[in-house]
Amino acid sequence: MDLNKKLLACALLAGFFLAPLAARQDPTREELRLKLPKPMFIGTPTNIKSANLEVITGRPRGPFYVPVGTRLLSLDRPVRSSDMRPVIGDVDMVTDGDKQGGDGYFVELGPGRQWVQVDLGRTCALHAILAWHYHSQARVYRDVIVRVSDDKDFTRGGTQVFNNDHDNSSGLGAGKDKEYVEVAEGRLFDPKGARGRYVRLHSNGNTTNDLNHYVEVEVYGTPVK
């Protein structure tokens, strides 16, 4: 390895370790405290096939820092869905605060492309969005897309927070994010302060079957004055 490559590697490592330290020392930010459900499975999945899967480390997610005053906005807020007659459960379960992974704690939507949408009641600045699709079994959900908007129909404006639909099979544009394995800590998406009243999450089946599931969605932020 030549000198330039060594210097670049050192700079990257320094940034990796110093960024969390800087966040901890920033008086305007605090660690997001989450109540996580009990893990339902242990170990690394071996039978999942995906051409766009992120590297599986098996390590827990590190701390995530948000502006001081950030709070949970989504608890018991109204939920709409592309499938208002779910196969199992009710869409209101998406924001009921219960993140357990067993039977009876998730809503099951029909096959193919589906979405759920949380109405926060007013425009908010968003600092973290978490989703639990189904974590009692290791699986990958396809075409996960997270969007934020002030338009309930998502036809005008809005912000795309996450998109791992690498081949545009959902028709909302190809994304550059990676697919991931569902685990009990859920998936945290960083909206980077995006503003909106509505949060919509898309999926398109999973590696076990063509159905779509949601245990819980949590949205953290602050109302816009």
Model regions and ranges:
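Short linear interaction motifs
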Residues: 54-64
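Trp- and acidic/polar-enriched beta-sheet ligand-binding modules for extracellular glycan
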Residues: 24-45, 82-84, 107-115, 123-124, ...
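Predominantly extracellular/luminal regions of secreted and cell-surface proteins
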Residues: 63-98
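Bacterial N-terminal signal peptides
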Residues: 10-19
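Bacterial N-terminal signal peptides that target proteins for export
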Residues: 1-10
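Contiguous beta-strand segments within globular domains
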Residues: 126-128
